[in-house]
Amino acid sequence: MKLSPIRRIFFAALPLAASLAVPLLAAHAQSGQPASLEDRRKVLNELFAQYWNANLALSPEFASSLGDKRYNDKISDYSPRAFNAWIAREQEFLTRLASIDPSGFTETEKASREILIRDFTDDIESQDFKEWEMPINQLGGIYSTYPQLADQLNFTTVKDYDDWIARLRAIPDAFAQVITNMATGIDDHRVPPKYLIEKALEQVKQLASQKPEDSPLAAPIKKFPAAIPAAEQERIKTETLAAVAKRDLPAYQRLARFMEATYIPACRTQPGISSIPDGAKYYEFLIRRTTTTDLTAAQLHQIGLDEVQRDEAEMLVIAQKLGFKDLAALRASVKDNPKFAPASPDALLAAYKNYATAMQAKLPSLFGRLPKLPFEVVAMPDYLAANGPAAYYMDGAAALSRPGRLSINLSKATTRSLLPVEATAYHEGVPGHHLQISLGQEQENVPEFRRYESYTAFVEGWALYAERLGKDVGFYQDPYSDYGRLENDIWRAIRLVVDTGVHSQHWTRQQMVDYFHAHSSIDETNIQAETDRYIGWPAQALAYKTGQLKILALRDKAQKALGPKFDIRAFHDIVIDSGALPLDLLEERVNAWIASQSTSPQ
């Protein structure tokens, strides 16, 4: 699972800079002469730059997370007015972008234009579903946004600290806007499941009850660069703690009171998103946006059933090799078996680190290009761990000297299974998220927005595909570890079944849990957390298998077409060197590569 740095959330209206090139195109149109390739390329690149700069200005948290400090003292406007104003601006961008004739553009230019058209189209369609009315759940929201941001930034100057203090003072305004949005959601009957918000409330209360000096919002003052004078350090400490104590903790407390007294009583009892107004239509939209395909919920459900059956057939082979009469006997043997549980939180963390380190040594045999950005394996913050996934990856940022981070959930560590740890380390770290996302950020000669595209089917599909690459380099030698790999794979197949089950076929939460129990030996802690995740984050879990199956199909196609010319390093490079793509554009890219390799001398 990948958590991105703070992206566009809800934006303040910002007038766009007038394009000097638009009149240029208009002049050509009026004269009856087509605009030259040079003129059209200039318009395209100016539009890309305008969009990117507007995006950063409207989402200052995202800008800061990338190392752009121009907006470090500002926070986003979370109001519906701001969101609708930004959608109107995107409509303007879309109209201008669609009017640019792509004839003669490079493949990169054509792809960039097409990607942005799709992004704008999706954003405009999402307006109908008023996503801002359900802004929090047990996985996060406004209550976790700024603690996470504090952890992503680096503080090297007095201005960095003063900018943070300005943000701390503004946080209550953001909380107030979000509470207003939630209240509107009550009126519109667009509310999350009650029990998930009860879990979120626990996290809000935890953050609200901390001493100012213990709050993650005050984390930046725990360490100062030596260049900052002692007197300034004391001033910064005083002002930071005052902002947290007098502004932010009361804001958390107000949010907690609103959630407990007003919001939770109004939240829905049904788990599926289809129970909200236009919920079925919304789920169809989420499927298209998440998978970048036209697959229906019914088709995805069937794919999930088929993949579960395929994985179970492979698991049976391992079970028989290990001397078990059937798969059920193997599952019963490993489930809740202390042999496969970590002895301590430190032991669990060490297991992830060891697998990631071993894989790093094998990367040159799988890839022609490796990222410059380092990554580290760390413990997940306590305020996220209670209801968080087993692990997640957070993007790094070279401009902030921030490595990519594989965060491990150490809560209830001794109740977790070690069996999926090897595959998860490859998924979240290398050659999964860290390698793909970091290489995407390091792309050259592309519009800036392309470095940070995050199509879930591509990003998570690649990471799930990456779990299998351990087999290619001789890992998973222990049959139990290979069984753990298949447990991870069937986990993602189960997602197709239970996500569509709850949101499209009106399954209950217990039906989801029962399906997990029937088809996996995943530990209970993860089953419960994952079930809640799919309920609270509709369709996101559909991306993993969808993307993985596409990449596997493209690899199989390339191997068959190229025969001895097939180079696994070159294939991987062509898949990930252009950043995240919609799956159909990825297929076009790989097909073009296959054609070029077919005609090249061996």
Where are the language model's segments positioned?
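Bacterial N-terminal signal peptides
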Residues: A12-P23
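N-terminal secretory signal peptides that target proteins for export/translocation
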Residues: M1-I6
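Short, cationic motifs built from Arg/Lys/His that form the positively charged side of catalytic pockets
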Residues: R7-R8, R555
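N-terminal maturation segment of proteins
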Residues: H28-Q602
